[in-house]
Amino acid sequence: MAKPLSISSHPSVHLAWRAYFEMTKPKVVALMLLTVLVGMCLAMPTILPVKPLVAGLLGIAMMAGSAAALNHLIDRRIDGMMARTYNRPLPKGRVSARRALLFAALLGSLGFVILYVFTNPLTAWLTFASLIGYALIYTAYLKRATPQNIVIGGLAGAMPPLLGWTAVTNQFHGHALLLVIIIFLWTPPHFWALAIHRRAEYAKVDIPMLPVTHGVEFTKTCILLYTILLAIACLLPVLVGMSGPLYFVCSSLLSTGFIYKAWQLKYQDSEGLAMQVFRFSIYHLMLLFMALLLDHYLWA
C-alpha cells in the first residue's frame, strides 16, 4: 500500500524563508516605508493615485530589503562576533553567502524594474543610489573607515521621504528635502546611543564607532547637540508653511522629550540610559512622521 506523501520538509522550507525575510530587516524597512508614505502624501493635495502609491511602496521596500541583505552579507564576519547580531542567518549558516548575494540581486533588480516601469525612472535611480550608498559606500567602506560613518552614510538612509515624493510627482521639491534633513539629523543620535551601549563589541571587531574612538562622554555631548539641531530642523515644516499647528505641537513635545533624554544621558550616570535614548528615538521618528501625516489631512 502506498504511503501518503510526507510534509516533513515543510518546516525547513518555512525556516529558510524566515531567514531570507530576516535579512531584509523588516522592522527597519517598515519604519522607512512610513516616511516614504508621508513623502507621498505631502506631495499631493488630493488623494494619492493608486499605481504610483502601490508600485512605489513595493519597489522601494524591495530595494531597501536588498540593501539590508547586502548589509548582512558584507557584515557576516563581524556579525558573528557580536552578541547583538551573532544569531543572524549568515553567521549561523542558515543562508550561504552565495544565496544571500543572489537573493539581494534578485530582490533589488525586481524592485528597480517595478519603480522604473510603474512609477518613474527618477525614483528608480534615486532608490538605486540609496542602495549603493547604504550597502556599499556605508557598509563596505565608511563603517570601517571613520567614526563619522553614521553622519556621512546617514544621507542614504535619509532619502525615503524624497523617494516617496518623486514616486508620485516625478520631480524634486524643497519640502521633500526638509524631510530628508530631519532624518539626516535624527540618524547620528539614534545610532550613537546604540553604539554607547555596544561599544565593547564594536571595539572587539575594530569598527571605529564614535564611543570607541573618542570616548563615551564626547559621544554623549554629540548626541545632545544633534538632538538640539534636530529640534530646530523639525520646526522647518512649520516655518515654510508646509505644516500647521497640530504638527507644531506634536513636534515640540517630541523634541522636548528627545532633548530631555539626551540631557539625562549626558549628565546622569546610568548604564541603561543609552538604550532608553535609542528606543525613544525610534518612537520620536515614527510619531513625528505620523503627526506630519495627520496635520496634512486634518489641518489642510
Curated annotation (Swiss-Prot):
It catalyses: heme b + (2E,6E)-farnesyl diphosphate + H2O = Fe(II)-heme o + diphosphate. One of its GO terms (biological process) is heme O biosynthetic process. Its main location: membrane. PROSITE patterns: UBIA. It is a multi-pass membrane protein. The keyword Cell inner membrane applies. It is found in: Cell inner membrane. The chain crosses the membrane at residues 28-48, 54-74, 100-120, 122-142, 149-169, 176-196, 222-242, 243-263, 280-300. GO terms for cellular component: plasma membrane. Pathway: Porphyrin-containing compound metabolism; heme O biosynthesis; heme O from protoheme: step 1/1. GO terms for molecular function: protoheme IX farnesyltransferase activity. Pfam families: UbiA. Its EC number is 2.5.1.141. The keyword Manganese does not apply. Keywords: Cell inner membrane, Cell membrane, Heme biosynthesis, Membrane, Transferase, Transmembrane, Transmembrane helix. InterPro entries: Protohaem_IX_farnesylTrfase (IPR006369), UbiA_prenyltransferase (IPR000537), UbiA_prenylTrfase_CS (IPR030470), UbiA_sf (IPR044878). HAMAP family: CyoE_CtaB (MF_00154). Carbon 2 of the heme B porphyrin ring is defined according to the Fischer nomenclature. Belongs to the UbiA prenyltransferase family. Protoheme IX farnesyltransferase subfamily. Converts heme B (protoheme IX) to heme O by substitution of the vinyl group on carbon 2 of heme B porphyrin ring with a hydroxyethyl farnesyl side group. This is Protoheme IX farnesyltransferase 1. It comes from Shewanella sp. (strain MR-4).
